[in-house]
Amino acid sequence: MQPYTKNWTQVTEFVMMGFAGIHEAHLLFFILFLTMYLFTLVENLAIILVVGLDHRLRRPMYFFLTHLSCLEIWYTSVTVPKMLAGFIGVDGGKNISYADCLSQLFIFTFLGATECFLLAAMAYDRYVAICMPLHYGAFVSWGTCIRLAAACWLVGFLTPILPIYLLSQLTFYGPNVIDHFSCDASPLLALSCSDVTWKETVDFLVSLAVLLASSMVIAVSYGNIVWTLLHIRSAAERWKAFSTCAAHLTVVSLFYGTLFFMYVQTKVTSSINFNKVVSVFYSVVTPMLNPLIYSLRNKEVKGALGRVFSLNFWKGQ
């Protein structure tokens, strides 16, 4: 932290270092992340298109998957294009204004929190479908789905308001180089000339509340699902259900594990380079894996993809 001096000028622009230690491999990493980004866009757009066009998928589960796909597109698009511009040295690709930096962090936090709550809602949907199939229509009606989705987006939007407001009250007189590929809270706090103790505490509590609340719903839901599956007599059906749950839990564990590591910590002095690697997992890798695990492995979605992208489907429209 630097001492306050009245004639210092407030920083109006930041420079993002990105992955500064890999200059020789910038083109390789550009191609890698561009491929992953485009793959994520194609996957999620395909799911949105298929669910929207195939009436057989007009069910609550696919309603939530559509919301998740929309969210993943926006989630990756907040940070990845700027990161790609920095890799290839586009003019101003590493520069970002103070206002744009706060906006990027707000949107990214909003979408990340919303995804946590959406994953919890989807886990609850699967819990009711598997553990209480006879009551599924009563507990997961279309009205309930709409209210759950709206609540996820609303609470997600409210989540970053206080943290970003507190961040906007901090002073930044320089240096203005962010040791990250996006405007993340920890490297920003490391640059502030103000006392960041209160800001760190609020970030910790907000992150902990979001992650614990949503992960507890997921843990309880899947715990009950596993208990129910253990009582299925057919070994083939039990194995099929277990493999699906294991795939879901793998992605959820990766997403939540990286988020817990990144945001439920109170010191900005943690390894920035390791944080950047962890950030790649929840901002690039997980959004690419989610459609594969939640949707594209699903036989109904595969069948719908075949129908939607067949000539007969479009001739009948």
Curated annotation (Swiss-Prot):
Subcellular location per the Swiss-Prot or TrEMBL entry: Cell membrane
GO CC terms: plasma membrane
Residues glycosylated per entry: N7, N95
GO biological process, one term: detection of chemical stimulus involved in sensory perception of smell
Extracellular side: 1-27, 78-103, 165-201, 263-275
CDD domains recorded: 7tmA_OR
Membrane-protein topology: Multi-pass membrane protein
Cytoplasmic side: 49-56, 125-143, 222-241, 297-317
Disulfide cross-links: C101-C193
Pfam families: 7tm_4
Domain of life of the native organism: Eukaryota
Alphabetic keyword roster: Cell membrane, Disulfide bond, G-protein coupled receptor, Glycoprotein, Membrane, Olfaction, Receptor, Sensory transduction, Transducer, Transmembrane, Transmembrane helix
Entry-linked SUPFAM superfamilies: Family A G protein-coupled receptor-like
Transmembrane feature ranges: 28-48, 57-77, 104-124, 144-164, 202-221, 242-262, 276-296
Molecular function GO labels: G protein-coupled receptor activity; olfactory receptor activity
Family, similarity comment: Belongs to the G-protein coupled receptor 1 family.
Purpose: Odorant receptor.
Name of the featured protein: Olfactory receptor 6Q1
Organism the protein comes from: Homo sapiens (Human)
Gene: OR6Q1
